[in-house]
Swiss-Prot record:
Descriptive protein name: L-lysine transport protein
Membrane-spanning residues: 25-41, 52-76, 92-113, 138-155, 174-191, 214-232, 247-269, 292-316, 340-362, 377-393, 424-440, 447-463, 477-495
UniProt record similarity statement: Belongs to the amino acid-polyamine-organocation (APC) superfamily. Basic amino acid/polyamine antiporter (APA) (TC 2.A.3.2) family.
Pfam families: AA_permease_2
NCBIfam families the UniProt entry points to: 2A0302 (TIGR00905)
A single GO molecular function term of this UniProt record: transmembrane transporter activity
Origin organism lineage: Bacteria, Bacillati, Actinomycetota, Actinomycetes, Mycobacteriales
GO cellular component, one term: plasma membrane
Main location: membrane
Length: 501
């Protein structure tokens, strides 16, 4: 039996120099959240909903994702010593495997998002450089691969260099978005066009409930990254900066998203928006000011995707490295180079990104399919973190067993009853919202997500047995059963041809 404390890795990681300021944390949140999704949101929403349902959807998403943001805000205050919130909160509260599955899902979602970002990047370039057009998918796949390894070379040089690049690209890409809002609001928005078919009764997109349900996956996709500050909590100069950066980043992104999606419905009808290409914001501005508007937005998209690509390649390696430091997967994966970068975790992430590039290329997978699959995987840590906050607010602790909670410093500041009640409301809203999102998702992507999660059992179980430790607690056994059943259903669907990307 290995008696070494599991918290050693996280605590050791916490001892690293804290160099990331609140401005950089906010830039990381906006940089990783305002990626490809915001540029395709007019077409994404227009394909499934009208302007009325869009407003209802943003109201639900705003409340839901704000509750998710506040979950990480509250947990950062209640457990200020825990690093990489998307991983540590679930592990301390619900068990080692739940923490592992949260980090594994977050990592896989980030990997798939990387491929989606790069695909949209080169498809946008294809409008101006025919070599990268949809007529040359092999060339685009090679270009995506080259970009992936180039970014690996950047992030492997350390946090400070990559974070600086993220800050620069975040500032650069916000400018075209602000130009879009100003130009459309004053030159192109028509209230009559916005209200002519408010509920899309002529668009063939179903009932209002179906429309709201349909846009949920896209609203989540464009908000993913809101937890970015908590992931990099161990590099923050101050733990209070983590909480403040999360809220500031959320409000900024929400204002951008609501403005862009609402203004688009005042320029083109729901049917016209649905027919646009992935870079639909460029087409909307082109309809207002001409071709130069499309070029401006395309430039912003390229800068946006580049910044998000760097951010997510940084973010996805972090939980993988911490799991290795904490003994949930082989410790060599957590190797740190002389520049302070988790180079082995970044290398493995880059290799897996390359594998998905090949898989998606062979299956001719669309950008929208990548979005839906990645979104379902991101929901795993959101759900478990929200559930942990509910447990803290109701019983003051998570599930206690020999391999969760007791090996961590589970202490925290004193919380008043009044604050606890507020935290319970936040946790319940975030939990219900996360469950609703799984319901709103298309079933095939839930099953594909389960199949992607299942292989993670191999390194986890092997490492636990090697260390002579208990593999699962009772709650985790239930999680594994659900995972195996869903993955089995997915495999059966693939075999009989009823399931495909």
């Amino acid at each position: 039996m290995n008696t070494q404390s599991d918290s050693a890795g996280s605590q050791g990681a916490a001892a690293t120099s804290r160099t990331v300021s609140i401005r950089t944390l906010i830039a990381l949140i906006i940089g990783s959240t305002v990626g490809a999704g915001i540029f395709s949101i007019p077409q994404n929403i227009g394909s499934v909903a009208g302007p009325g349902a869009m407003l209802i959807g943003w109201l639900i998403a705003g409340v839901g994702m704000l509750s998710v943001a506040f979950v990480f805000h509250v947990l950062a205050r209640r457990k200020p010593h825990l690093d990489s919130g998307v991983y540590a909160y679930a592990r301390v509260g619900l068990g080692d495997y739940v923490g592992f599955s949260s980090a594994w899902g977050y990592w896989l979602g980030s990997v798939i998002a990387q491929v989606g970002y790069a695909t949209l990047f080169f498809s946008t370039l294809g409008h101006y450089v025919p070599l990268f057009s949809q007529d040359h998918p092999f060339v685009s796949a090679l270009a995506v691969s080259a970009l992936t390894w180039l970014v690996f070379g950047v992030v492997s040089r350390g946090i400070s260099q990559a974070a600086f690049l993220t800050t620069v690209t975040t500032v650069a890409k916000i400018l075209p978005l602000l130009c879009f809002i100003i130009l459309v609001a004053f030159l192109g928005f028509s209230w009559e066009k916005f209200t002519v078919d408010l509920w899309a009764r002529d668009g063939g997109v179903g009932s209002i409930f179906d429309q709201v349900r349909g846009i949920m996956v896209y609203t989540v996709w464009v908000f993913i990254g809101i937890e970015g500050a908590s992931v990099y909590s161990r590099q923050a100069r101050s733990r209070s900066d983590v909480s403040r950066a999360t809220v500031i980043g959320f409000v900024a992104v929400l204002l951008l998203l609501v403005s862009i999606s609402s203004l688009s419905f005042g320029v083109l009808t729901q049917q016209e928006l649905a027919a646009l290409p992935d870079n639909s914001m460029a087409s909307v501005l082109e309809a207002v000011v001409g071709p130069w508007g499309a070029a401006l937005i395309s430039l912003g998209l390229c800068l946006s995707v580049l910044g998000a690509y760097v951010s997510w390649q940084m973010l996805c390696a972090e939980p993988l490295a911490l799991m290795a430091m904490d003994g949930l997967i082989p410790s060599k994966i957590g190797a740190i180079n002389s520049r302070g970068a988790a180079w082995m975790a970044q290398l493995i992430s880059t290799i897996v990104i390359q594998i998905f590039i090949i898989i998606f290329f062979l299956n001719e997978t669309t950008y929208v399919s990548m979005v839906q699959l990645a979104t379902n995987l991101y929901l795993v840590p959101y759900l478990f973190s929200a559930f942990y906050l509910v447990m803290l607010a109701t019983r003051g602790k998570g599930i206690t067993h020999p391999h969760a909670g007791t090996r961590f410093d589970d202490s925290g500041p004193e919380i008043s009853r009044r604050e606890n009640r507020k935290h319970l409301i936040v946790g319940l809203v975030a939990t219900v919202y996360s469950v609703w999102l799984f319901y709103a998702a298309e079933p095939q992507f839930v099953l594909f997500g389960a199949m992607a999660m299942l292989p993670g059992l191999i390194p986890y179980v092997w490492t636990r047995i090697y260390r002579g430790e208990q593999v699962f607690n009772r709650f985790e056994i239930g999680v594994v059963v659900v995972l195996v059943v869903a993955a089995s259903a997915g495999v059966i669907g693939l075999v009989n041809g009823s399931l495909s990307l």
